[in-house]
Amino acid sequence: MNIIRGKIPSAQKVVIYGPEGIGKTSFAACFPDPLFIDTEGGTKHIDVARLPAPTSWTMLLEQVQEVKKENTSVCKTLVLDTADWAEQLCIKHICDKYKKSGIEDFGYGKGYIYLKEEFGRLLNLLELSLIHI
């Protein structure tokens, strides 16, 4: 019988949900060695390390890949602030790719399937890391 004792190293994945101004960003700033990908500009008045605000979905994915490549040498916690603004970048990317003016223009729910698949790429990138998210 193979018994394993002790902690198994793994990163914590946390989602913080709440209305604007409740302190989600301030709370995340207290996490171990945080690095923010600030999609909405919520860290302007907080002394934190941040990457340039992504202007496209591709830029956001590239930032995550770079942090992942550096692993824990660049930060211990990667904070995506916020997921709903990241989703808007994703929607714009999908609409541009398929030459649609909006996510509803694909027909019965198809745009949301593309959104789920594309956003899943980001979640997979985040999952394969030893950095807290």
Residue ranges and their predicted role:
Residues 2-80, 84-89:
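Conserved P-loop
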